[in-house]
Each structure stands twice: as structure tokens, then as C-alpha cells.
């Protein structure tokens, strides 16, 4: 296929047993036979630079280019890069070749045919005739890389090698090269002799350039693919390397492994495990890493996180929830840092499958050197929890360094309240890590100034105060200017609310002295499952608490099969305010239940016996409608499923629902919901006999 074209692809999973929107290379690998050249970038800076290389190469080679980079991991990352000015691009642009390409466009003044039908006697010849273009392509792509280097100072090769000149073990990889590169530099300082080849041009695969990249001292090679081809003897890059080394008649032990399927994190500790595998007399081949394969035993074990980053790099984790502004504020914080300091910065956020109110975990790194660490923060200097309900659900302090800062957004400002409400595992970890512990009721501050759940500016101010990355006390003024710039289009009132939130934030920040007694606390009480909970959920519940990485392969069912109706056991408890029903105002229109997207506020009918058994707080009124005589009516919310969206209260025609602070009524309404779930089904109710629900 000869046609000058370029597409830039954020590579994603071609879903198998379940849907996934995260990173993998299976979609790119499905295009291998199309005749398109395939180019890989390993970080944000490379994605910027090689995008230009791809366009230049397409023009000079007459081959279409697919330029890809890791979806989500790189495509959704915010990082500081050096942009190429347009005037510099103009200096190396091949105008003559581009004009020649334009002349080949379909035009009635000089027509020709494309996409014709060919019979068996001539089709094959027409396939082979294009081979010279593919043979010449690698050198032309390298020439394009050299041209880009002439205006940027950043030199790329088809296969970029980093490591010891006399390396005996080498990893070959696409997409995760900078993480491997970071680990290689660390291991070589420890006395190892290892290296990495970052593949940039996967198609056409150049034997000559690959041979030049592999050190002559190399005895063993580990090829890492970010995809899995069931039934194949190996994955695509591995098979290419095996064939190439065989054709070059170079002797080396070659093994393949699979990394990062479905967006699974790939860390320096895993890189070290791959190198350690090559040291064995018989290295494991076609292994997986990042999971515990206790079924086929193909996985490699790996150790604790490695300190591969420079000491000056500050790493932070922000546990937020969808719609609270945490993700946006971390991105803005990174931009403020880069614009107003000499630091480089990186931000990347992880999301769950929920929309508003879902879990978000934002990872931020700040350092003097460019940051190319394409994995989640593992050793944090600063951890912030923006939702108090997370304290009991997640192990947020696991990644905190000893002596690091932990900030909690909660209504518990005294040690007595924290003692009562925090789980033992969190208190024990804070004490053992000698953490600097701060608490702020950011939600109350936001509500007091009219921002409802938007705590982003409050927590951003706390971050810059406790981590003075921006020197000279300039952060407050910069934040105020940022508020005006970001929210100016929404009106003066919104700007004033955010400025007031900034002013009040630090006055509500409290330093907590962690009691020494917390260090010896026992474990929390074991989880008690409701009667009837399926075994499937009991087995896989760690996935609900961001601990799915701990689950071995044997816990899963082939084909991704699972029981229906398991969401009722999740009970996220993320609401800050929930609707409380006023029976006297309610007209029983049921609009609230119709509009609730989470189906967590519902109408209930009670017979006389159920009314008698109801808790004192479970008030009800006679139901409207002839067919409902003798029954009582109640609107009840599931406090633990509510997301505080307020749609029900806003749309109630008689204002019968009042959004009330969760901590005031949450426990009461949860018990009311439990009773509501025991009520009997009253059967099908005729539309003419009661107020319509739809």
C-alpha cells in the first residue's frame, strides 16, 4: 500500500473476555499486515517529536505511517516537554516531495484509477513490486530522525540503545521503554551490566539497524510485548526479534514476556525481575509479570519498589472522587509549577468505571530533570485523601514514605474524633511511618462559601502550603490569579466563591499529633457479609477497594463470567449530603425515583403490619389511589448509594426533599433503607389507581 498518510493512535485493548478502555498494543498489532509503517513512542516528549518524524517519513517514503503511544498512560498524561516551534519545522519540511504528493491526487484533469480488481495471474506481481519502497524506508526514517535532531538536539534512532556498552543482558521493548531505561541506569550503578533497546520503527523491521543496536557482548535478550496472542508460539515483537537474530546468525538466549495487559502497571521492580530471569540457567519463556499466575505458573515474582528516581523528585498522590475537581486541580498545579519554577512535572490520573462520584487517584511528580517514569507513584512524599469515606475503604498510606505528609479531608478535627472514626490499619500505618498528619474539613469550607462539593482550590492551597515547591511565598498570589483565569467566564460570583475558599482554607487546617499508641493497634474487625452474598463477591471483593492487583489468576472464571446484580453489595458511601423526605409536603408523584440515575431513592408501600414493625424513624403516610386503600407510602433513599447529585431535590415540585449533611442522618437513613428492603412486593399497580411513576 503506497499512499502518504499518517494517523496517531493512543493504543488500547482489543477487548476479549471483558471491555477495557486502557492501554495495550493489541489494536496496533492487528494492523501488521496492512502495509502501514508502525512507529512507537515511549513517553510524552517522544510522542511530540516522533509525530513530526512520522509525517516527514510518510512524505519521503511514500508509505503510510501509524504512529502510536500508550493509550491512557501517555495520551492522558500531563508532562512538561520542549515543543518544536513551527518556524523550525519549516526549515526541514520537504516541500518538493509534498508538492509531488499533491500532484498524485485524483483529479479530472489528469485522471487515473485506484482500487481496481486484479485476477490471479497478475495480483501477486503487483504485491511484490512495492518491496523496494519498504526496503528503502528504514534509512529514510533515520534521515527524518536526524533532521528533527538538527532542530531539537534530541537524537532518535530506529532502535535506541541505553545501558552498559558491554551489557550481557538486554531488554527489547515498545511503549514502556523509558521505565526500563530508568531501571537500567539504576541497576548499572549497582554494578550490573544490562541494557535496553527501545523500538521506534516496528514496521518495516530493519535487521541492519537492530543488529547495530544490540551490543556484541549480549548473551541473553528479553523481549517484552504489551499484548497477548493466545495460541501463538510468541507475541509479535518477540517473534520478530527471534527471526531477526536467526537471520543475523547471532547466538543469544531469547525469551519473551507479556507486560501491562489492560493497563496493568509496569514498574522498575518488574523490570529487575525480567533481568533476574535472564540470569537463570534456563530462563522462563513466554512469562507474564504483574500478576500471580497460580494456574499455569507462567508469572515472574518481583520485589519491593526500587528507588530509581533522583532524590530531589517529589512524588504525591491525591485520592479524590469524580466531580470534586481533584483531577483538574492536579493538572493545574503541574502547569503552575512548570510555568513559575525551573522544575519539570508530571501528572497522571487513574479512574474507576463510575462517573460522578467515582474514585480518582492522581499521581504527581516534580523534579529538576525531565520525568519519564511511566508508572504510578510508589513512594510518595505527600498523600492527600479528599473524601473521608475512603479512610475505611482504601489503604492510602501504603505508598507514603517514612516521615511523609498525609492530609485528610474530614469533619474530625480532634484526636478523639479521629480515634473513633479512623480504622486501625490507617492509624497504625501513620504511627509506624512517623507521618506528618493534617486534617481539614474542606467540604464544610466549600459548602460555607457556596461551592458545594468542589473542594479542589481548597486542597490545592493546602498542597502548596505543605509542599512549598513554588518558592518565595508566591503560591497564594498565583492561585488567586489562576482562579480569576479559570473561572472568569463563569461570572464574578463563582470567582468570589473560589477566592473565599482559598482565604478560609488554611484557617481550617489542623496539625494532628499522632499518638505513639497507634503504632501497636491490632487489626480491624473482619468483614461481615450479609446473608445471601454470592461466593464470587466474597472472593473478588478486593477489586472494589482498589486492591485487585493482589488477586491471583485462580480466583477468576474463564470468559469473564460473573453473577448478575452484584452492584447492590458495593455501597460506596460517597455522599456528603443526602435527600431527607418530608411526608407532609410530598404529593406522591414519584418524580424523584424516576429521575434518580443511581436508582437509590425509591417509593415504598407498606401494609398495616409493616407499618407497626417499622422503626420509629420510618414514617409513612396513607397512599394516594383507590387501589391502594389500606396501604401506606414512603420515599426512602439508600444513603450508601447516593452520590449527592441533588437531581431529586432540585426537581421535586413541592420541595419535599431536603439535602441534609450525611454525617447527621446517614446512619439513620441506612437503617431505614435496610427495613425498606424487607417490605413485601405489593404486586402490579394499575396506572389509573395511583400516581404514575413514568
Q: Which ranges hold each PLM region?
A:
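Conformationally flexible catalytic loops at phosphate/diphosphate-handling active centers
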Residues: 65-160
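Short acidic, glycine/serine/threonine-rich loops at helix termini
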Residues: 16-22, 49-53, 76-83, 87, ...
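Thiamine diphosphate
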Residues: 31, 142-290, 363-365, 380-382, ...
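Glycine-/acidic-rich phosphate or pyrophosphate-binding loops and their flanking alpha/beta elements
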Residues: 146-169, 299-313, 568-569, 620-625
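Active-site cofactor/cluster-binding pocket
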Residues: 204-208, 217-220, 224-235, 239, ...
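Ferredoxin-type iron-sulfur electron-transfer modules and their immediate structural context
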Residues: 488-642, 649-693
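Structural signature of the thiamine diphosphate
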Residues: 40-100, 263-303, 497-519
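Conserved thiamine diphosphate
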Residues: 19-71, 95-96, 243, 247-260, ...
Amino acid at each position: 500500500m503506497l499512499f502518504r498518510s499518517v494517523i496517531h493512535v493512543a493504543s488500547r485493548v482489543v477487548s476479549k473476555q471483558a471491555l477495557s478502555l486502557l492501554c495495550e498494543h493489541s489494536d496496533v498489532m492487528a494492523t501488521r499486515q496492512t502495509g502501514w509503517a508502525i512507529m512507537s513512542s515511549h513517553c510524552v516528549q517522544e510522542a511530540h517529536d516522533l509525530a513530526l518524524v512520522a509525517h516527514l517519513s510518510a512524505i519521503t517514503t511514500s508509505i503510510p505511517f501509524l504512529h502510536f503511544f500508550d493509550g491512557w498512560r501517555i495520551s492522558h498524561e500531563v508532562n512538561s516537554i520542549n515543543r518544536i516551534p513551527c518556524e523550525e519545522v519549516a526549515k526541514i519540511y520537504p516541500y518538493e516531495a509534498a508538492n509531488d504528493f499533491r500532484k498524485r491526487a485524483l483529479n479530472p484533469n489528469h485522471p487515473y484509477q485506484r482500487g481496481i480488481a486484479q485476477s490471479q495471474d497478475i495480483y501477486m506481481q503487483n504485491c511484490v513490486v512495492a518491496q523496494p519502497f519498504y526496503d528503502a524506508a528504514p534509512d529514510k526514517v533515520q534521515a527524518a530522525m536526524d533532521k528533527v535532531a538538527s532542530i531539537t538536539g534530541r537524537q532518535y534512532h530506529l532502535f535506541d540503545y541505553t545501558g552498559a556498552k558491554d551489557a550481557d543482558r538486554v531488554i527489547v521493548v515498545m511503549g514502556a521503554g523509558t521505565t526500563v531505561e530508568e531501571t537500567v541506569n539504576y541497576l548499572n550503578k549497582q554494578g550490573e551490566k544490562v541494557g535496553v533497546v527501545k523500538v521506534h520503527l516496528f514496521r518495516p523491521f530493519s535487521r541492519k539497524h537492530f543488529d547495530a543496536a544490540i551490543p556484541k557482548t549480549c548473551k541473553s535478550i528479553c523481549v517484552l510485548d504489551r499484548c497477548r496472542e493466545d495460541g501463538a508460539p510468541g507475541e509479535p515483537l518477540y517473534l520478530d526479534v527471534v527471526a531477526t537474530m536467526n537471520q543475523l546468525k547471532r547466538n543469544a538466549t531469547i525469551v519473551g514476556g507479556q507486560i501491562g495487559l489492560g493497563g496493568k502497571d509496569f514498574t522498575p521492580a518488574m523490570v529487575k525481575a525480567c533481568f533476574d530471569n535472564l540470569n537463570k540457567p534456563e530462563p522462563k519463556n513466554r512469562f507474564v509479570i504483574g500478576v500471580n499466575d497460580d494456574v499455569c505458573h507462567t508469572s515472574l515474582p518481583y520485589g519491593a519498589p526500587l528507588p530509581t528516581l533522583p532524590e530531589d523528585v517529589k512524588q504525591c498522590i491525591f485520592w479524590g472522587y469524580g466531580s470534586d475537581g481533584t483531577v483538574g486541580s492536579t493538572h493545574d498545579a503541574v502547569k503552575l509549577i512548570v510555568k513559575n519554577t525551573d522544575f519539570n512535572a508530571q501528572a497522571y490520573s487513574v479512574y474507576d468505571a463510575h462517573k460522578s462520584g467515582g474514585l480518582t487517584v492522581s499521581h504527581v511528580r516534580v523534579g529538576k530533570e525531565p520525568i519519564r517514569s511511566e508508572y504510578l507513584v510508589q513512594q510518595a512524599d505527600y498523600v492527600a485523601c479528599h473524601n473521608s469515606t475512603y479512610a475505611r475503604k482504601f489503604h492510602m498510606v501504603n505508598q507514603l514514605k517514612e516521615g511523609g505528609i498525609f492530609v485528610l479531608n474530614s469533619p474530625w478535627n480532634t484526636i478523639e474524633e479521629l480515634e473513633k472514626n479512623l480504622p486501625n490499619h490507617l492509624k497504625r500505618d501513620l504511627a509506624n511511618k512517623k507521618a506528618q498528619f493534617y486534617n481539614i474539613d474542606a467540604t464544610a469550607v466549600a459548602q460555607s462559601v457556596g461551592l458545594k462539593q468542589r473542594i479542589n482550590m481548597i486542597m490545592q492551597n493546602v498542597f502548596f502550603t505543605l509542599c512549598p515547591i513554588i518558592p518565595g511565598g508566591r503560591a497564594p498570589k498565583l492561585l488567586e490569579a489562576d482562579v480569576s483565569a479559570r473561572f472568569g467566564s463563569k461570572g464574578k460570583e463563582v470567582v468570589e466563591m473560589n477566592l473565599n475558599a482559598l482565604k478560609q482554607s488554611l484557617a481550617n487546617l489542623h496539625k494532628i499529633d499522632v499518638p505513639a499508641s497507634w503504632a501497636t493497634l491490632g487489626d480491624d474487625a473482619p468483614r461481615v457479609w450479609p446473608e445471601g452474598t454470592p461466593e464470587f463477591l466474597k472472593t473478588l471483593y478486593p477489586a472494589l477497594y482498589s486492591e485487585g492487583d493482589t488477586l491471583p489468576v485462580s480466583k477468576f472464571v474463564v470468559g469473564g463470567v460473573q453473577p448478575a446484580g452484584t452492584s447492590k453489595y458495593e455501597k460506596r458511601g460517597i455522599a456528603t449530603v443526602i435527600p431527607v423526605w418530608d411526608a407532609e409536603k410530598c404529593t406522591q408523584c414519584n418524580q424523584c425515583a424516576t429521575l434518580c440515575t443511581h436508582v437509590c431513592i425509591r417509593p415504598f408501600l407498606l401494609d398495616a403490619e409493616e407499618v407497626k414493625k417499622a422503626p420509629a424513624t420510618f414514617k409513612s403516610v396513607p397512599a394516594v389511589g383507590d387501589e391502594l386503600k389500606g396501604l401506606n407510602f414512603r420515599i426512602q433513599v439508600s444513603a450508601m448509594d447516593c452520590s449527592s447529585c441533588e437531581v431529586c431535590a432540585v426537581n421535586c415540585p413541592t420541595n419535599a426533599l431536603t439535602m441534609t449533611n450525611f454525617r447527621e442522618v446517614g446512619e439513620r437513613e441506612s437503617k431505614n433503607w435496610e427495613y425498606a428492603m424487607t417490605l413485601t412486593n405489593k404486586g402490579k399497580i394499575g396506572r389509573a389507581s395511583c400516581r404514575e411513576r413514568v
